[in-house]
Amino acid sequence: CLFFLPASAQKKDKCNETEFRAKKQAYMAKKAHLTQEETEKFFPLYFEFQDKKKEINKGAWGNAKKGIKPETSEEQYEEIIDNYFDEQERIARLEKEYIKRYREILSNKKIYMLYWAEIKFSRNMLKILQEIDDTKNKGL
């Protein structure tokens, strides 16, 4: 996966979702100091939540793409925006449900540390993708 490769090797490695999740899991578990047992119990729930969130977002993006068309009306933009925030509320409710389930496995401190690790992982991925984009734009 991109996150774990030097810039020169990134183009050669196409990371599939399973590999990406494994690396994300390892990174987050390490940063949150999870035990093997905690890791085995937590991450199936975490990825279950991620899958549900992905499905909700897929619907939101489908609606948002309608706004790309130049003939989109103000009423349609209003609907797109309202749908987007409805989807975000659905995700927030779902996440609260999963937090309750996480608390059956982990302390609040470890849940916090996992969320922080997830943010750092995402930021690192964005930096790497930006570096790749910058390299492509320089013609290298």
Please state what every model-predicted region is.
Residues K11-M28:
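Short N-terminal segments immediately surrounding and downstream of signal-peptide cleavage
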Residues F3, Q36, E40-F42, L114, ...:
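Residues in flexible loops and secondary-structure boundaries
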Residues A7-A9, A32, T39, A117:
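Small-side-chain structural scaffolding
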Residues K24, M28-I105:
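Amphipathic alpha-helical segments
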Residues E48, A92, K96-L140:
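Amphipathic, charged alpha-helical segments and their helix-to-coil junctions
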Residues C1-C15:
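Bacterial Sec-dependent N-terminal signal peptides
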